[in-house]
Curated annotation (Swiss-Prot):
Name of this protein: 3-hydroxyacyl-[acyl-carrier-protein] dehydratase FabZ
Primary subcellular site in the record, as a coarse category: cytoplasm
InterPro entries on file: FabA_FabZ (IPR013114), FabZ (IPR010084), HotDog_dom_sf (IPR029069)
Entry superkingdom: Bacteria
Length: 155
């Protein structure tokens, strides 16, 4: 990706997301990125459907999206910011830390989750983000996460 492309991308469909992230079904937790503001903020979207494999066991009679997958959606949205800024195809963004995770409300099939991520620190290839997950504007989960860009020849 050119420097111009990395700074002008304002949103990303699933094809662009798959260029930025190595994740694939069933572990790609972001369907679309509706907003990217440089390397500072992004909003990712996950459309939750009952057809997702985790709902067969979590929980069959009352399906609830596992909290760890909400965290993963936040991390993938943050990872898209890192990968976009890095601009080097093939490099990986590793999820390093999670702090202050809180789950406020259940997320169920039919919900549209928005992952709001905001960079609050970057030093070299280490990034720190504050993340919120929202459904219909209501906070359902939040966490502070850390990520690291790893060159493909060092992965």
């Amino acid at each position: 990706m050119t420097e111009e492309a990395t700074t002008t991308l304002s949103s990303a469909d699933i094809i662009e997301i798959m260029k930025l992230l190595p994740h694939r079904y069933p572990f790609l937790m972001v369907d679309k990125i509706i907003e990217i503001d440089g390397d500072n903020t992004a909003i990712g979207i996950k459309n939750v459907t009952v057809n997702e494999p985790h709902f067969t066991g979590h929980f069959p009679e009352s399906p609830i999206m596992p909290g760890v997958l909400l965290i993963e959606g936040m991390a993938q949205t943050a990872g898209a910011i890192c990968a976009k800024k890095d601009g080097q195809p093939g490099n990986l963004v590793y999820f390093m830390t999670i702090e202050n995770a809180r789950f406020r409300k259940p997320v169920v099939p039919g919900d549209r989750v928005e992952f709001h991520v905001r960079k609050h620190k970057q030093r070299g290839n280490i990034w720190k983000f504050h993340c919120d997950a929202k459904v219909d504007g209501a906070l359902v989960a939040e966490a502070d996460i850390g990520a690291m860009i790893v060159r493909k020849d060092q992965a």
